Amino acid sequence: MIVGLTLYFVLFRSIQYLLVFLTPIRQFDTSTSLLLNELCSSPSEINSYWNKYFWNKLLSWDSVFFIKNITSKNGKPQFEHEYAFSQLWTFFVRLFIKSNNDSIYHALRVGVAIENVLFYLSGIVLYFLTKKIFSQNIRQSQFARTIAKKTSLLFFLTSAAGFLTSIYSEPLSFFFAFVGIWSRECSISVPVLGQFDISWRYWFPYSFISMACFTLASLNRSNCVLLGIYFIFDLIELTKNRKFVKAICFPLLSGSLMFSALLYQQYYLPYKTFCPQRGEWCKSQLFSSIFITKTSLYSYIQSHYWGVGLLKYWTPNNIPNFLFAVPNIIILIYSSIYFSKIYPSYNLKALVWITRALVVIVCFFAHVQILNRIASFLPLHLWYLADRLVKTSDPKKMENPKGDDKIVKFYIYWLAFWIPLQTILFAAFLPPA
């Protein structure tokens, strides 16, 4: 099964990179050429065959900021707004770059290789996570394997498309998110009577591995902070069942450590780096002697430089961006309904909460089209699609789909259209971002 998934992954990626190669070399935005002229000493290197027809095209949108941070002397951003781009990802890529090779193309090739390895490993981890979720007994084991295979294939066919051909930070969070969810799933137990519990022997995988993975995923991508809802859910369930000591030693401890790490990254480090000289957000301290401000540096950057905030994106000129996100909005909402109302599963209850929270936050507070790029760190919609595809595998049923199967069919057709289109748009430095 793993060999089959590997072959599919190689095939999908080869097609995408071929599309990048075939995309016209003239990009819509000039950021790439300006950056290359700044960082490359030799014009001949920029215009060499493979760089001109392939590698330069991968430096689009956020990749420009990532490669700039990765190739800087100390790995630190030059300007304030560049702190919005994961420092953890920058640090991780720099670990694999030879110290005596300062070529931007060497860094790019290493980053792309790491991107693909993490993307592939995330799909493999997701396969085993899916098997764990859906094989509650021996009779379901074959069904679980089928669901797991389709889920991983759908993950490889993500709507993030062209973004993941470059050096974006998402695959690092995908990997940590899936390992963290898998570790938690292996730790909890839900007996027949529904008494949620966590055995003491699973303290390490729950309170360390899951906590560490969720924390690293969140430090890398801020949307992954929603994974902390797992700890809130478990805390509520253990408290309801009067397992107070376990509630403290498992979810409360894990959640507190995760919160502390985020507090350190989002508030303490920026305050020590920029304040009080910076002014503006630095002056919004809740208390005069404490580093916690009303607005974190990341929130300030998102609001000040990219116009992120409640309903700020709800303008007529952004209607096309909402339309780009509609397929994923629909599939995420319907997957949360499917696993809470139609085929309710206690094991997926917390993930349903997280999925709904993601949709609300992105639709009302963020640039809504990024949902296409970030949604895959949550596998609920992939499980919904895979489950429906397995249950409607009869060709006659697919010819005349009914109800939510029409949604599934539409989404698959949309992916077949969107993935190659978005890959080409990305390589040409064209919207959507």
Swiss-Prot record:
Origin: domain of life: Eukaryota
Gene Ontology cellular component annotations, sorted alphabetically: endoplasmic reticulum; endoplasmic reticulum membrane; glycosylphosphatidylinositol-mannosyltransferase II complex; mannosyltransferase complex; mitochondrion
Pathway(s): Glycolipid biosynthesis; glycosylphosphatidylinositol-anchor biosynthesis
Full protein name: GPI mannosyltransferase 2
Membrane topology, Lumenal segments: 23-109, 183-215, 265-318, 372-409
InterPro entries according to UniProt: PIG-V/Gpi18 (IPR007315)
Molecular function terms, GO-annotated: alpha-1,6-mannosyltransferase activity; glycolipid mannosyltransferase activity; mannosyltransferase activity
EC number: 2.4.1.-
Organism for this UniProt entry: Saccharomyces cerevisiae (strain ATCC 204508 / S288c) (Baker's yeast)
Glycosylated residue positions: N69, N101
GO biological process: fungal-type cell wall organization; GPI anchor biosynthetic process; protein mannosylation
Keywords: Endoplasmic reticulum, Glycoprotein, Glycosyltransferase, GPI-anchor biosynthesis, Membrane, Transferase, Transmembrane, Transmembrane helix
Subcellular location: Endoplasmic reticulum membrane
Family: Belongs to the PIGV family.
Top-level enzyme category: transferase
Claim: Cytoplasm is one of the keywords in the record: no
Annotated function: Mannosyltransferase involved in glycosylphosphatidylinositol-anchor biosynthesis. Responsible for the transfer of the second mannose to the glycosylphosphatidylinositol during GPI precursor assembly.
